[in-house]
Amino acid sequence: MTGQIHFNSHVWVVTDVACRLVNALTAGHDGTRPVEPPPIGHRADAVRAVLERDDYRPALTEDQANALTALAERVREVFTASSSGDVARAAGIVNDLLEEFGAAPRLDPARGGGFTLHFHGRDTSIVLGWGAGIAAGLAMAIGSDLAGRLGVCQADPCDRVYIDTSYNLGKRFCSRRCQSRVKAAVHRAKSKGRRRRPHSHRGSSGRYPYNQASAV
């Protein structure tokens, strides 16, 4: 028992890529640090760093990187809506993405034999391919009991997104760094509150001294 929920392997790959594209390509805060998307003309490297695996090194133009950056902005809206409990809005955005990218199911040969269900776009271009795959992965997550697992970090001002793979849906932060920052802030607030608490005028016996009690 690992204490984690395991997504279907294909769903996990595409939703994980969706999450990392949002965090790499959209503006906001990473922890307390303000972040901006890579400037136009320098996005291909950032997108490639997200997509690359040992067996997959895509060629990518700046135009394609710009299109995937625009996709990341819309995927952020899905995470934000799902995290706030507005699953209907998240579903509406995903439905639009499914239609736009022409996501269609297809059985592809698997490495170990047999076949694996994948989703393809209307053509084999990298933008339509990943757009369709991400839209389908998000659709399968939102259309199941995984809907509540698309989250936005709650360590203000951080707004990086994450996928909650815990069994108890207990994840609230994008990283241990943000979790530690919030815990430290709570501890400081409690300590400050204790220091400000008025001292009791009771004596060691728990009763007021005679002169104070008689003055009441």
Question: What is each model feature region?
Answer:
Residues 182-192:
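Short metal-binding segments enriched for Cys and/or His
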Residues 169, 192, 202-205:
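Feature targets compositionally biased, intrinsically disordered low-complexity regions
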Residues 168-179:
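Cysteine-rich micro-motifs
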Residues 1-152, 156-164, 197-216:
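Short helix-coil boundary/hinge micro-motifs
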